[in-house]
Amino acid sequence: MSFEYPDNLKYMDSHEYVRLEGDVATVGITAFAIDQLGDIVFIELPEVGDELSQGETMGNIESVKAVEDIYAPINGTVLECNTAIADAPEQLAEDPYNNGWLLKIKVSGPAALDKAMSASDYQAKVEG
């Protein structure tokens, strides 16, 4: 099965995506990861104002199949959490790249996305 991977995003090995606009990063979970998880029943996100460090756990996502950690793809401070998705996590699968974002992070320091993949590289990794 093939999924959408927008070219304007960067993708992490742990299946988070990042849309960087100036010093604000919008973070979410890829369509591939959502499909692998199945029906999502709960999302735990950090609080507004929390400091995040790249690679550290920043929350988790629970489905009928598993509970998986969500990792911070970038260093920064949480500006906003998508409370609509937290309140109705089943909607995440409907539009993961637009309305399905999880967090907005004010990036601290240079945007270190050197480990991030392009859309085509991520697609090759997950779809073989």
From Swiss-Prot:
Gene3D superfamilies: 2.40.50.100
Signal peptide: none
UniProtKB keywords: Lipoyl
Keyword Signal (UniProt): no
Free-text cofactor note: Binds 1 lipoyl cofactor covalently.
GO BP, one annotated term: glycine decarboxylation via glycine cleavage system
Domain Lipoyl-binding: 24-106
Disulfide bonds: none
GO CC field: cytosol; glycine cleavage complex
Highest taxon above the source species: Bacteria
Modification N6-lipoyllysine, positions: 65
Cofactors that this protein relies on: (R)-lipoate
Cross-referenced SUPFAM superfamilies: Single hybrid motif (SSF51230)
Record's subunit section: The glycine cleavage system is composed of four proteins: P, T, L and H.
Similarity-based family: Belongs to the GcvH family.
Function: The glycine cleavage system catalyzes the degradation of glycine. The H protein shuttles the methylamine group of glycine from the P protein to the T protein.
Protein name: Glycine cleavage system H protein
Encoding gene per record: gcvH
